[in-house]
Amino acid sequence: MTELSGQPPKFGGSTGGLLSKANREEKYAITWTSASEQVFEMPTGGAAIMNEGENLLYLARKEQCLALGTQLRTKFKPKIQDYKIYRVYPSGEVQYLHPADGVFPEKVNEGREAQGTKTRRIGQNPEPVTIKFSGKAPYEV
């Protein structure tokens, strides 16, 4: 079983009761490492101060963790690239969720197959009128 470590950020507000329900069902944890204390926007509203070193924050929804992760990767200097998202069950079991194979989805990973790509430039796309009555779907052409 994975043991999560880190200090919670300094936050003077509340989560609006969202974590009380999450304690009965499931909650999500995001961990990251920061080189310095910095102010960041909480996905639940308000601002908090992240600690220098390891940080651990519990949130009620995975989308909130993903939003905070995007903020960590884009708004800070140096960029914080090492965040991880976990699902925490009421039993204490921890499941690692994101990034699933260790590389963020928009990055190229050795062995990751490209999905829905066409090996042509946009100017080489067929004319829509030639596809319309051909019996083929646009994604098949």
From Swiss-Prot:
Gene Ontology, cellular component aspect: photosystem I; photosystem I reaction center; plasma membrane
GO biological process: photosynthesis
Pfam families: PsaD
Entry's transmembrane regions: none
Region of interest (Disordered), residue spans: 111-141
Keywords, in A-Z order: Photosynthesis, Photosystem I
Source organism, top-level taxon: Bacteria
Function per UniProt: PsaD can form complexes with ferredoxin and ferredoxin-oxidoreductase in photosystem I (PS I) reaction center.
Oligomer status and interactors: PS I from Synechocystis PCC 6803 contains seven different polypeptides. The polypeptide corresponding to subunit II from higher plants is missing.
Record family assignment: Belongs to the PsaD family.
Protein name as it appears in the record: Photosystem I reaction center subunit II
Organism in which the protein naturally occurs: Synechocystis sp. (strain ATCC 27184 / PCC 6803 / Kazusa)
Gene: psaD
